[in-house]
Amino acid sequence: MKAVVSKLYCSSMEEVMVVRRRPHVVNGGGFVVTDYKEKIVFKIDGCGVLGTKGELVLRDSDGNDLLLIHKKGGVVQALSIHNKWKGYSYDYQGSPKPVFTLRDPKHSCFSITSSIRISVGPGNCYFDVKGYFPDRDCSIVDSKGNVIAQVKEWIGSRDIYKVVTKPSVDKAFVFGVIAVLDYIYGESTSC
């Protein structure tokens, strides 16, 4: 898989990351991602920290912004059968550049499909989310049907779960998608 956000976050081997939800009352919500050594890799802040509904930020362990993700709004969005989220990374000059678009079906009787689709860059590169995120049982699958990441339940806890990423997968992209899933399902990044 080609890097979506940065090749700095791609690994040559499969990795298991642990996600810990932060309570809204303590840190404004969001979550922290650690590696197997319990070292912080990413922090995700939602509207409890940012103060803006429909906006998320993925940061590296040093607090540098990697992805700005926001929900599209406006009249066209209101008439659409999908909610649309856009993810932006920052180029070397600090300017935002579009990285991915995630579409999830709005909860309505007009929604034909329940699939969540992520489009990446120019061309027809896309990913789908299979399974149900709130149950901590879902996968991000590429257009060829290959699983690139899996969200799995951590036994006995809703606030901690694990994410297994396959080799050569951009973990910043994966956790950007997971941040949106967390928000869509009203979890730690939502207001």
Swiss-Prot record:
Name of protein: Protein LURP-one-related 6
Phylogenetic classification of the source organism: Eukaryota, Viridiplantae, Streptophyta, Embryophyta, Tracheophyta
Family: Belongs to the LOR family.
Classification via PANTHER family: PROTEIN LURP-ONE-RELATED 6, PTHR31087
UniProt function note: Might be related to the phospholipid scramblase and tubby-like superfamily of membrane tethered transcription factors.
Coiled-coil region(s): none
